[in-house]
């Protein structure tokens, strides 16, 4: 029967089912494949069961109940038919809940959930809250994005997170794990943030993983194991059967926000942040024959950073049904009061970026011939005195995802939010990231009181010698852009001196802050604090050529990281300003970069380095003069011994080591004193990057399928949140939420847009079809769950309105790709710094003028 059939046909199908003439399951597939149902959808009920944004919804197996998790850290089981709450569970989570699932075959009594601080809770509805709070897994570093259960398996579940690992837990072995630096349950180490997972319904041993390098990797779980089971592979390529990347995203870091298998397992739906939705066949292999871009082509693409704009923190004006593109607002004269100021500051940053980019280009040409000994005065004079950020490799995943700094935040007194990180073993360590309430309203009704932690670092003696004019350093801004988490991007603000900025710039502007939410990680704490007896030094067996190849390989294979780097500072104050609950942390005056990343603009890295910027290449390239990397020149006595043992443990962890390093975000790693830990982290990061590069090279020799895009679905906008779902509905439809507050439904086979539903005042994140009936549940920034069913008497699809929304979304998607969210305090600090710079320049001009007059008088 055709999809465009009429109701009499459907009634006849019902009649045949009642007579036993047809399989009952076929009726569902037929009515779910009809446009009549899709285009008659209407809001049937609203479930107001939460006090925060609803980030996850899930039907039970019978379709009778809905499990939901929210920013209020509560789990709620509700009945959408009676509109009543069955159970409200105080989950024990201390950060926003991002994913929650019923364990299969447990009569809806057992639940697994994860949150922004990385903690996973295993909850039994029939047990008391205190018992459930003991059943937690704190294994992940950073945000845990998704929980996935295995069909018909009540004992095991999987999780993925910012640390780049996919972990497999078995509740028969343990129902909790608070072990420090736990690696027992790692199933796959992707070496890139793993943001989404999906299991093939008919063949559950096929596991799809979406990573922050734009790739979707499909694994055969039968070939994988964990350390707990005794057969951990330790390689990211083991068990991989397919790897999918849209061709235009090959050189970009575009995060996967949603993965979904079709019911028959023949196709996979992938939704990308700041991009579109793609359908591909995992068994396809036609992309293998396509030419991959050369390293030079990849570097050339990385050299064209986009010009960024600024958006005030808490400004959700670009979301919701009434959002308009900037060009349309200007035309209609609807500019908000702060637009002109934001535009001016955006223009200012753009000028800085352009200047710095020109400097980077010139440095790239000079870097090959310049001796390592130092930087000429003429080179210094060409560098900008304002923040230098030529490596503005903020990729097209300019989501609003904040950099965590939970160690700077005091616990909130509100039950709906807690910024104090959960710690189970050490007061200086805590699971990373506490993405807080992500709604605009919550920013006004909740706030986090930030405590000031002041850390002062002394300048290196070499730095003082290299400084052209002591006492003339100008304070400039140091920015750190990060995209970890699920809601919004932010900039971390730092102050440094002019020479620090110049030294950083003279190195080819190669000091990069980690992007992807600092997903390119640091070393485990166990590697940082080895036994004191371990004092034997083992230098890495890497030559300068190897390091150079590593730098170029990283430039080519780790494309367009989502960050802004301006400089690192030898003198800074780690003092957070304020933190609103709306979008994770606010502005943090902290170390601007924990791990320098070599990019295309730092080709040979032959420029001088400051003590604070002792990067990976310096630790390995200087073998000819000093076989051991130099970290803190002032480290003496016991601290020096600790430094040596710490360095040793990092150096010993090469790519041949059994201790496979995972991505550890910078906020988790900053617990150590001084720069010693940071330097060790950079060495560890070097080995991890090299290991990743080797695995990527192995992909060419392995029999791994590379599917081509089968269909692309456009019209929606997915840029402001990292938990936006795309889903199949029946055999003939595909749907997704959007930043415009609408639900989009397309024809699966033709990508024709069939339905548009206004479903949220800001952003629709979650869409879950009923397992049997033509009912849809949705949620987003609003504090409720909406139930949709085909109640309209006639089709209500407005094609003209849909075309208008699609056009606006396309324009605003381009705008959002080039937009960075900054807190209001950032503007104030920036203006104050600029004022200081101007004052110092005027004073310098006066002193220069008086000096010239004195010289003229002497000559006379």
From Swiss-Prot:
Show the stretches that span the lipid bilayer.
none
**Matches recorded under Pfam families:** WD40 (PF00400)
GO terms under biological process: positive regulation of transcription by RNA polymerase II; protein ubiquitination
Q: Which GO terms describe its molecular function?
A: transcription coactivator activity
**Residues carrying Phosphoserine:** 336, 649, 657, 847, 850
Q: Where is the composition biased (Polar residues)?
A: 379-388, 409-421, 480-490, 627-636
Q: Where is the composition biased (Low complexity)?
A: 422-441, 502-511, 614-626
What is the tissue localization of expression for this protein?
Highly expressed in skeletal muscle and testis. Expressed to a lesser degree in heart, prostate, and adrenal gland.
Give the pathway listed in the UniProt entry for this protein: Protein modification; protein ubiquitination
Q: Which residues carry this modification: Phosphothreonine?
A: 654
Which portions of the chain have biased composition (kind: Basic and acidic residues)? 288-303, 312-334, 457-467, 535-549
Q: Where are the WD repeats?
A: 49-88, 92-133, 139-179, 189-229, 251-290, 718-756, 759-798
Q: Which UniProt keywords apply?
A: Nucleus, Phosphoprotein, Repeat, Ubl conjugation pathway, WD repeat
Give the SMART domains listed for this entry.
WD40
Binding partners and assembly: Interacts with the nuclear receptors NR3C1 and AR in the presence of ligand. Interacts with DDB1, CUL4A and CUL4B.
Task: Name it.
Answer: DDB1- and CUL4-associated factor 6
The lineage, from the top, is:
Eukaryota, Metazoa, Chordata, Craniata, Vertebrata
The gene designation is DCAF6
């Amino acid at each position: 029967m055709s999809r465009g059939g009429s109701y009499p046909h459907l009634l006849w199908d019902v009649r045949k089912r009642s007579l036993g003439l047809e399989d009952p399951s076929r009726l569902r597939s037929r009515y779910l494949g009809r446009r009549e149902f899709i285009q008659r959808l209407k809001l049937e009920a609203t479930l107001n069961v939460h006090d925060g944004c609803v980030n996850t919804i899930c039907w039970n197996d019978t379709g009778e109940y809905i499990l939901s998790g929210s920013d209020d850290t509560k789990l709620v089981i509700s009945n959408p038919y009676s509109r009543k709450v069955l159970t409200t569970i105080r989950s024990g989570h201390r950060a926003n809940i991002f994913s929650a699932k019923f364990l299969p075959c447990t009569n809806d009594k057992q639940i697994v959930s994860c949150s922004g601080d990385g903690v996973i809770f295993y909850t039994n509805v029939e047990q008391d809250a205190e018992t459930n709070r003991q059943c937690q897994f704190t294994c992940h570093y950073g945000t845990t994005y998704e929980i996935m259960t295995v069909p018909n398996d009540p004992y095991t579940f999987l999780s993925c997170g910012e640390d780049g690992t996919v972990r497999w837990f078995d509740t028969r072995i343990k129902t909790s794990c608070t072990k420090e630096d736990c690696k027992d349950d790692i199933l796959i180490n992707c070496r890139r943030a793993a943001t989404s997972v999906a299991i093939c319904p008919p063949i559950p041993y096929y596991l799809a993983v979406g990573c922050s390098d734009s790739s979707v990797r499909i694994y055969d779980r039968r070939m994988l194991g964990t350390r707990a089971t005794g057969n951990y592979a330790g390689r990211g390529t083991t068990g991989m059967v397919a790897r999918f990347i849209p061709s235009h995203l090959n050189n970009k870091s575009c995060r996967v926000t949603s993965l979904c298998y079709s019911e028959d397992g023949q196709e996979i739906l992938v939704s990308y942040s700041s991009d579109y939705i793609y359908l591909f066949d995992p068994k396809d292999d036609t992309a293998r024959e396509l030419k991959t871009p050369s390293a030079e082509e990849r570097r050339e693409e990385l050299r064209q950073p986009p010009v960024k704009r600024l958006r005030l923190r808490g400004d959700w004006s670009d979301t919701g049904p009434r959002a308009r593109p900037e060009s349309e607002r200007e035309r209609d004269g609807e500019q908000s009061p702060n637009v002109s100021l934001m535009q001016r500051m955006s223009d200012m940053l753009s000028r800085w970026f352009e200047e710095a980019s020109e400097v980077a280009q010139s440095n790239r040409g000079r870097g090959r011939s310049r001796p390592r000994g130092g930087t000429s005065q003429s080179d210094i004079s060409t560098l900008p005195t304002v923040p230098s950020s030529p490596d503005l490799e903020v990729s097209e995943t300019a989501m609003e995802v904040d950099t965590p700094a939970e160690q700077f935040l005091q616990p909130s007194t509100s039950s709906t939010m807690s910024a104090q990180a959960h710690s189970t073993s050490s007061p200086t360590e805590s699971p990373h990231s506490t993405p807080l309430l992500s709604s605009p309203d919550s920013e006004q009704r909740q706030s986090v009181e930030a405590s000031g932690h002041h850390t002062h670092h002394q300048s290196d003696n070499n730095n003082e010698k290299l400084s052209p004019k002591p006492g003339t350093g100008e304070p400039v801004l140091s920015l750190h852009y990060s995209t970890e988490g699920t809601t919004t991007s932010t900039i971390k603000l730092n102050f440094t001196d002019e020479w620090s900025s110049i030294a950083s710039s003279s190195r080819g502007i190669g000091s990069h802050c980690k992007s992807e939410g600092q997903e390119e990680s640091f070393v485990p704490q166990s590697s940082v604090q080895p036994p004191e007896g371990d004092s034997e030094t083992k230098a890495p067996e890497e030559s300068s050529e190897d390091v150079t190849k590593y730098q170029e390989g990283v430039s080519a294979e780790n494309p367009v990281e989502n960050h802004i780097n301006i400089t690192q500072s030898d003198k800074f104050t780690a003092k957070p300003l304020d933190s609103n609950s709306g979008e994770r942390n606010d502005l943090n005056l902290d170390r601007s970069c924990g791990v320098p990343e070599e990019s295309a603009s730092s080709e040979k890295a032959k420029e001088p380095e400051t003590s604070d910027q002792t990067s990976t290449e310096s630790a390995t390239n200087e073998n000819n003069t000093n076989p051991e990397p130099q970290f803190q020149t002032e480290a003496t006595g016991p601290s020096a011994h600790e430094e040596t043992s710490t360095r040793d443990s990092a150096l010993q962890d090469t790519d041949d080591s059994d201790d496979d390093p995972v991505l550890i975000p910078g906020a988790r790693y900053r617990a150590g004193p001084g720069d010693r830990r940071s330097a060790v982290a950079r060495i560890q990061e070097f080995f991890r990057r090299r290991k990743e590069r080797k695995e990527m090279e192995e992909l060419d020799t392995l029999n791994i399928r590379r599917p081509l895009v089968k269909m692309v679905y456009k019209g929606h906008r997915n840029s402001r949140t990292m938990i936006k779902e795309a889903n199949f509905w029946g055999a003939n439809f595909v749907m997704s939420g959007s930043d415009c507050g609408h639900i989009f439904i397309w024809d699966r086979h033709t990508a024709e847009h069939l339905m548009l539903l206004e479903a949220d005042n800001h952003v629709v994140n979650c869409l879950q079809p009923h397992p049997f009936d033509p009912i849809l549940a949705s949620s987003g920034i609003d504090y409720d769950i909406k139930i949709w069913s085909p109640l309209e008497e006639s089709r209500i699809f407005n094609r003209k309105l849909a075309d208008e929304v699609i056009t606006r979304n396309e324009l605003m998607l381009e705008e959002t790709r080039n937009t960075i969210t900054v807190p209001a305090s950032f503007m104030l600090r920036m203006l104050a710094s600029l004022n200081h710079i101007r004052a110092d320049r005027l004073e310098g001009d006066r002193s220069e003028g008086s000096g010239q007059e004195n010289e003229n008088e002497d000559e006379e």
